[in-house]
Design a protein with these regions (language model features):
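C-terminal boundary/linker of central alpha/beta nucleotide-binding cores
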Residues: 23, 29, 45, 49, ...
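Loop-to-helix "switch" segment enriched in basic
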Residues: 268-314, 337
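Alpha-helical sensor/transducer elements of the RecA-like P-loop NTPase core
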Residues: 3, 13, 46, 92, ...
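Short amphipathic recognition helices of helix-turn-helix/homeodomain-type DNA-binding modules
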Residues: 1-9, 23-27, 34-35, 41-84, ...
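C-terminal helical "lid" of AAA+/P-loop NTPase domains
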Residues: 249-253, 260-271, 304, 316-320, ...
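Conserved P-loop NTPase "ATPase switch" module shared by AAA+ and STAND
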Residues: 170-189
Length: 379
């Protein structure tokens, strides 16, 4: 039952007209009428308390009406950012997300692989399946649960101060909803448990550098060379790529086929239309990560964020990996390079693989391309 319907029920049970309730409470007749008709769905706390006092309700009825007053409006909520028009090479991953029957999808991978772009594009494609709304929350920002409550229509004065109260209110607001939620930049399983919309009609898409648990889990790596060249062409124009396709392929290989790095390279070329593609290739060969910055996009900065969230031992091991003669590393070799025990080294390598700073396979661990250049710069 809605707040308005319950208010109408209690007013009639008390034998009061709207005018009489207005006189007792100090709330205008028009406001009472709007609330009862559902045109004003989330009254201010002082308005609610004035009506409760005027109706003379018992404590249980007062709590029920207070709870309904905190309920979110029924119109759809929307806070998705625009999606990037040039998302390429991710058709299979988009299909996996848009056809899943699970309530939770985790998209994980190294910095710069396009996790957020994929999640946002999928959310836009799924809009018609979630009529109650689509929400986007940056989990690393302050008070993500409080922000969710605000996005769901709860006024600041109705948000409980304690975390347990916020969680209970959040769960009550999700009940019966068909809503899609994107949780961007999740670090821990606890954040997923607290924030995910775990209701039968809801879907939560999580992006994370870590391999978090989920029934549907998608690992993003680099693009194929063909897709990376397609992304470059969408930014600088196909004419410049077609003029020197071999150099364009060389450029995306230098970028490690990372969507972020290719986008930065493309932006640099787009803002310098007289530059031949070869010129940027030579810059990257000479300066490596220092050449891959454009505006607020920065490959090195993305790697630094990944590294900063790891334990000190993992950071130490990564710095020592810049001394490697090759690209592969074992726990024994990492232990020798860092001056630590093999078990500690194994744990550190797993931590690095978790955030995409190392590739892991049955043969061990390896680092390539731009990540290798980053490690070299720290050695």
């Amino acid at each position: 039952m809605t707040f308005g319907a319950m208010l109408l029920h209690h007013r009639k049970s008390a034998g009061l007209s709207q005018e009489e309730l207005s006189e007792r409470s100090g709330v205008s007749v028009r406001a009472i009428s709007d609330m009862e008709r559902g045109r004003a769905r989330s009254p201010q706390r002082r308005t609610t308390e004035a009506l409760l006092d005027a109706l003379g309700l018992d404590e249980q009825s007062r709590e029920e009406l207070r709870g309904l007053a905190r309920k979110a409006p029924r119109h759809p909520v929307w806070s998705l950012p625009p999606y990037v028009a040039d998302l390429v090479g991710r058709d299979a991953e988009l299909t996996t997300i848009t056809t899943t029957h699970d309530r939770l999808v985790v998209v994980h991978g190294a910095a710069g692989t396009g996790k957020t772009s994929l999640a946002v594009k999928a959310a836009h494609l799924l809009e018609s399946r979630f009529p109650d709304g689509q929400l986007f929350i940056e989990v690393e920002s302050d008070a993500p649960l409080e922000r969710l409550l605000r996005d769901l229509g709860i006024s600041a004065e109705h948000v409980p101060e304690d975390a347990n109260g916020q969680t209970r209110l959040y769960r009550s607001l999700l009940a019966g909803k068909r809503l899609l939620l994107v949780l961007d930049g999740v670090s821990t399983e606890e954040e997923v448990r607290t924030l995910a919309a775990d209701e039968p009609g809801c879907l939560t898409i999580v992006t994370s550098r870590r391999r978090l648990n989920a029934c549907t889990r998608i690992r993003l790596g680099g693009l194929t060379e063909e897709a990376a060249v397609e992304l470059l062409a969408s930014i600088i124009g196909p004419q410049r790529v077609d003029a020197d396709p071999q150099t364009a392929r060389e450029l995306v290989r230098l970028c490690g086929m990372s969507p972020l790095a290719v986008r930065i390279a493309g932006n640099r070329l787009a803002s310098r239309p007289r530059w031949p593609v070869r010129h940027l290739v030579e810059l990257i060969e000479e300066r490596r990560l220092a050449a891959l910055t454009a505006g607020d996009l920065d490959v090195r900065g993305a790697f630094e964020v990944s590294l900063a969230h790891l334990p000190e031992t993992a950071r130490l091991v990564f710095r020592r990996l810049g001394r490697l003669a090759g690209t592969r590393v074992t726990p024994e070799l990492a232990a020798e390079l860092a001056g630590i025990g093999v078990i500690e080294a194994q744990r550190a390598l797993e931590d690095l693989a978790d955030v995409g700073l190392l590739d892991a396979d049955d043969a061990g661990y390896s680092l390539h391309g731009l990540v290798r250049a980053f490690a070299d710069s720290l050695a």
